[in-house]
């Protein structure tokens, strides 16, 4: 299904993975969490692009049919639906070979970070916004909000909460405007950056 909604958002398909990965890599190139996971600047952009395409999009987001794009590939939101918002042990094991190829010697560091993030992840059924990224040249146009509204309207209609981790004060401010509230504290290991777990109850 590639039908575009009234907001200009469409459900992404597997063939969109390379373009969406480029958008995410550009959006998160200087993100403090991305820098922590991949500290070597010289090859960070290329490795981010490979990680988004080969791991997060092809193996996680797109198979769940809850990854959305807007204005072609200018913005992307990767959601995981209720009941699938946490990766089980077997899922994580299946991802390890692809992660090892992309992350190389940074794999142990990444696994520690993922473990810290998972430790505060709520168990109650919810929609999980794994990542939301907009091409830097298109930021400030409201594309992120339009991507958010697409699934948050469904959350409200189905009376299901939503959860995410914001990685910057700027993204946290966006999510606060859309009804999310702070839900505890999270800091990545080894004096890593702060993240903001956020929870949103469905609105009437």
Model-derived features with residue positions:
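A short beta-loop-alpha structural element at the N-terminal edge
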Residues: 8-22, 26
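Conserved GNAT-fold acetyl-CoA-binding loop/helix
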Residues: 31-54
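A short helix-loop-beta-strand connector motif used in the catalytic cores of GNAT acetyltransferases and
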Residues: 47-68, 122-128
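Conserved beta-hairpin
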Residues: 61-79, 135
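Conserved acyl-donor/pantetheine-binding loop and adjacent beta-alpha core of acyl/acetyltransferases
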Residues: 76-133, 139, 189-193
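Conserved GNAT acetyl-CoA-binding A-motif
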Residues: 125-128, 154-167
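Conserved acetyl-CoA-binding loop-helix of GNAT-fold acetyltransferases
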Residues: 140-153, 177
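Conserved active-site alpha-helix within GNAT-family acetyltransferase domains
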Residues: 145, 157-159, 168-185, 191-192
């Amino acid at each position: 299904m590639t039908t575009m909604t009234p907001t200009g958002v469409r459900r992404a398909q597997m063939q969109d993975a390379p373009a969406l990965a480029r958008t995410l890599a550009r959006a998160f190139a200087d993100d403090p969490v991305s820098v922590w996971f991949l500290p070597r600047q010289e090859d960070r952009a290329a490795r981010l692009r490979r990680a988004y395409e080969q791991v997060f999009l092809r193996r996680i987001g797109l198979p769940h049919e809850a990854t959305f794009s807007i204005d072609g590939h200018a913005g992307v939101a990767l959601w995981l639906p209720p009941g699938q918002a946490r990766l089980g042990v077997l899922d994580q094991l299946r991802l390890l070979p692809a992660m090892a190829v992309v992350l190389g010697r940074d794999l142990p560091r990444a696994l520690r970070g993922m473990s810290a993030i998972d430790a505060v992840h709520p168990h109650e059924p919810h929609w999980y916004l794994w990542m939301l990224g907009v091409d830097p040249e298109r930021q400030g146009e409201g594309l992120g909000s339009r991507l958010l509204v697409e699934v948050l309207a469904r959350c409200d209609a189905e009376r299901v909460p939503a959860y995410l981790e914001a990685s910057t004060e700027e993204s946290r401010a966006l999510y606060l405007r859309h009804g999310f509230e702070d839900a505890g504290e999270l800091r990545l290991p080894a004096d890593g950056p702060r993240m903001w777990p956020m929870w949103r109850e469905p609105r009437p």
